[in-house]
């Protein structure tokens, strides 16, 4: 049975970024991204296979992560890295179990969501560098006044061959479902589009499985609204990134339950 999690952590979605030291290098990763400050996105982690970046993921609790199902089309032995920005503190953890959504389609990328259980919980000493993101209830809506940011260690363009050492962030806007379908056609209710018309800010290779986090006006908590899923290339005009819509999946109902270990 699946372990039940609770997303109602009092600390979820509240990053505690450390003061910025010096100026930004101006490196642009993710597409059109800028360097994050250490502790700014404490739920973002990277997944590595054979020493190389494989995908991103988000922290849900001390021993569970959420990512994209397409990252695990072949179950692999994965290591998890939590990388901070400037000081580059690294914590490595092993994945014990991968739970891919039972309806995931490798052809359409529908239900592109997976849960990862760590072999050992995060040590409390890592706080505040490691904190959970909040999961949205099914009634949660995002408006134009929300701030939405995609983060990751992926490439800056389709041709790029060098990964950044600093976590990148890029602010994007959510498109209506009608506009999303105009761009791609085969868009299910479990998907959403986000980006900018010029394509100047987007996710790219290596960002898959990572978070699209949105914050309500007034500096409230950050919620995991989307998971980087697919798109037509990276940073192309009028072709936004496509994300798994977290609120439209029954995994959310499981994750919002009272914490209960059923192993």
Named regions from a protein language model:
Residues 1-263:
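Extracellular "complement/coagulation-type" protease architecture
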